Design a protein with these regions (language model features):
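Donor-sugar nucleotide-binding helix/loop cap in glycosyltransferases
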Residues: 1-259
């Protein structure tokens, strides 16, 4: 799911449920499969291998002698939110994977996503060209579950609007940025970049943030998580995607972590 190709059965809810079961106690593979897919349901297809593999790739579980155990502190899977923060903290480890590459390419398209094809299924071919490897419609269906869950934006029917507010909020916490402290914007980018290269341009000479990241930062500003500012005598100037309707129309120099 993350190391290579995306698969639709490995949805976040299944991965979380599997982790919660083994958080209670280690299970044999057969026991775990029965709890996840009880025989009385008479399912003709088993998806167990797909979501178990996703959990293993993420380092959430480990298997030894056909016994599956939790591989992280139980707090990492205490809730769907805590599992999301765990995954976001480790996402850069999968930079060669299909999920990472597709997410990176989609955000790099900037606001062009508003004017092109609206169905993720139809975007499989252009995204395949963008990342230089095959992407099919089923893999795009798998992508939508995780890209929404990890906080990169909002899904409306089969159109995905990039707004990385939840992801960025997680990354602010993961990076250990101090509440109440004002940072130059360059300092802020340096702090979050080890966890956010998937959507943040890692060339500091550009000093420009794409549409989805800009949407996320403005949302965090609006709800009081951060305060964006352009202080006139500051030279560390970064550009958001222009939006005249917002108090932060384009340029920023400082950011304060509010909560």
């Amino acid at each position: 799911m993350f190391q290579d190709k995306m698969v639709t059965p490995a949805i976040p809810e299944r991965v979380f449920t599997l982790c919660r079961i083994v958080a209670e106690k280690a299970n044999t593979e057969a026991e775990l499969r029965e709890k996840m897919e009880p025989a009385y349901l008479s399912q003709t297809t088993s998806y167990f291998a797909d979501y178990r593999t996703a959990a293993e790739e993420l380092g959430l579980i480990s298997t030894a002698d056909r016994v599956v155990s939790l591989a992280v502190d139980p707090s990492a899977v205490a809730s769907m939110d805590s599992m999301r923060r765990y995954v976001n903290a480790h996402l850069e480890e999968f930079s060669a994977g299909q999920f990472y590459r597709v997410t990176q390419a989609y955000f790099a398209w900037d606001a062009q996503v508003l004017h092109g094809k609206k169905s993720l299924v139809e975007l499989a071919e252009p995204l395949a060209k963008a990342i230089g490897r095959p992407v099919d419609p089923m893999e795009m269906r798998a992508w939508r579950f995780w890209v929404s869950y990890l906080g990169f934006g909002c899904l409306h029917e089969m159109f995905f609007l990039p707004n990385a507010d939840v992801f960025l909020h997680d990354v602010i916490r993961i990076a250990g940025l101090e509440t109440g402290r004002a940072y130059s914007f360059g300092e802020f980018i340096d702090a979050i970049l080890p966890y956010s290269r998937v959507i943040v341009d890692d060339d500091p000479a550009q000093r420009r943030l794409n549409y989805g990241v800009s949407n996320g930062l403005r949302t965090l500003h609006d709800i009081g998580v951060v305060r964006l500012e352009h202080i006139l005598d500051q030279e560390d100037i970064w550009s958001l995607y222009p939006l005249k309707a917002h108090p932060i129309t384009e340029t920023v120099t400082n950011i304060t972590i509010c909560g």
